[in-house]
Amino acid sequence: MERVICIAEIGLNWFGDIKLAKEMISLSKDCGADIVKFQLYRPKEILGINSPYLKDAERGVPTEAQARELKEYADLIEIEWCASVFHPGLVDLTEELGVKRYKIASRSVKDLVLLKRINETKKPVIMSVGMSDDTEISRAMGALRDVDDISLLYCVCLYPTNVGAINLDKLDKIRTRYQTRVGFSSHCPKIAPTLAAVARGATVIEHHVCMHRISRLGCDIPSSLNFKEFKKLIGYIRDMEQLNG
């Protein structure tokens, strides 16, 4: 069984507190995660000034200086740092930081200008396709034509996602149609769907992580696992990798 890339999506759950962000990076490594991920975008432009999520985003999206500090810390403790980039201009920053790969969020699959800029880097891409139809995914793949390593992640864009809303048959459909590695980006506060996805051949998994699952702390908390749960999830995945047949 191919080794599964496990991504700890810290996202907005560090609330603009650098000390907390570093603690979460360290805990992600202790859990066995391969990658810690943040989000880079301009909140007012993406969400609009009347969005109920704007306050969370403005404190949870790193500034350039914060992104540098967090990347340096991740390098120091030897865990890969990655970001979902929502603007073509921010690719210059991530290239300066020396990221190894790019994560493309579901909402960015239609942004061909962004995808073409990422294509220029020729670095591996992990792309969530939960909001896209076949035409949109095909166009995105065309924009990424120079990228040799692409993984497409099935996800359900409900926050949080109930188990009954998840259809893992789509993993097989994505794999067959696009001949790529497939994965699962979960917004479900349970580990069973992710384990089922790995059993169905997912080679990349992504999950939001948080210190405490208290909804009032932030908009991503209800979709997150705490670190005890995340460690258990990765432990089960590593056990599954050792199974034969």
Per-region residue spans from a language model:
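Catalytic cores and adjacent flexible loops of soluble metabolic enzymes
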Residues: 1-245
